[in-house]
Amino acid sequence: MSSLSRFLLRGNFSFSTHTNRRFFSAVTAAAATPSPPKPSLITLVNDERDPKFITEKFKKACQAEWFRKNIAVYERTVRRLAAAKKFEWVEEILEEQNKYPNMSKEGFVARIINLYGRVGMFENAQKVFDEMPERNCKRTALSFNALLNACVNSKKFDLVEGIFKELPGKLSIEPDVASYNTLIKGLCGKGSFTEAVALIDEIENKGLKPDHITFNILLHESYTKGKFEEGEQIWARMVEKNVKRDIRSYNARLLGLAMENKSEEMVSLFDKLKGNELKPDVFTFTAMIKGFVSEGKLDEAITWYKEIEKNGCRPLKFVFNSLLPAICKAGDLESAYELCKEIFAKRLLVDEAVLQEVVDALVKGSKQDEAEEIVELAKTNDYLQCKLRLFPKE
């Protein structure tokens, strides 16, 4: 009998009888058959709602080797526990991995380090990295990069540069382009943009080649932080070095142009990305909408909004945060009303404050029935519960 089965038969599992039966069936089947019903066991973990039971189910499921190979279920479980503020249980399920032979494999350990980093638990990530030699697990650029990523994702920006300078020489690790890219991201995070840009030359001096990720980090940092001229210089260097620009490169520049009210140049750049056979995504259209809204060109902004769905994308709430207040301010209450109805009909996300702004505008514009309808839709829909006031605050 497998250890999983013995555990369950002892009666220590604190779930409901129905849940016990389902979990027992899945785990014993996983242990007894050559081809385990993987989706069933994963589903049992994913479908659980109680953080305590998520933790217990996950730990027991980890006894199946194939389950430990599933990256997605680890990421989802850690994310859900962190969202519930149960960081002690994040630590519990990741510490549980120490009992398995996977922890002697660098790829698996790098995953654990990254998972800690994604939820801001850098000290735990550092501990896992430091303990690798005890498990006869060699540390290379793979785990080093995971540690750097954990540091950046945990927003420990002041520590990134020190780790980068200290560990490679100490552990005989040769940083690669991915290492430098993470360092660049960390420097940008602490506001050291000039030092981050200077690393392009250092990368090349090391015999490495900056890639599109290197430049995309710098493009995003410059264009989104109001450093338009610096962004244009980075873009020019990218072209000069013949680094292929992807949709993220174009999106960053489009946003920069939008913030500078350069709608004509935005349209020209959009045509270029299409000419380069790149597929625009929702962020592309969000930037276009933002630019036209900023210039007060609402008809054009609405036209670009309609392009989102035509291109197989779903609008993000940032689109409505930009578009709806502008439409209300322009006095086009009918369009604002219709757009709100579309949001609920298509189950799209929007901030409650933006919806309230529309309701207030409708009431002030003597469109009481329309305002009441939006309030009712916000109250009765089954995916986005909002408590809207029918009358504006005085």
UniProtKB/Swiss-Prot annotation:
Subcellular localization, as worded in the UniProt entry: Mitochondrion
Keywords assigned by UniProt, alphabetized: Mitochondrion, Repeat, Ribonucleoprotein, Ribosomal protein, Transit peptide
Predominant localisation class: mitochondrion
Domain of life the protein comes from: Eukaryota
Pfam families: PPR (PF01535), PPR_2 (PF13041)
Family the UniProt entry places it in: Belongs to the PPR family. P subfamily.
First and last residues of every PPR repeat: 105-139, 140-170, 176-210, 211-245, 246-280, 281-315, 316-350, 351-385
PANTHER family: PENTATRICOPEPTIDE REPEAT-CONTAINING PROTEIN PET309, MITOCHONDRIAL, SMALL RIBOSOMAL SUBUNIT PROTEIN MS78 (RPPR3A)
Quaternary structure, from the entry: Component of the mitochondrial ribosome small subunit.
Transit peptide: 1-24
InterPro entries, alphabetized: Mito_RNA_Proc_CCM1 (IPR051114), Pentatricopeptide_rpt (IPR002885), TPR-like_helical_dom_sf (IPR011990)
Annotated GO MF terms: mRNA binding
GO cellular component term, pick one: mitochondrion
Name under which the protein is recorded: Small ribosomal subunit protein mS79 (rPPR3b)
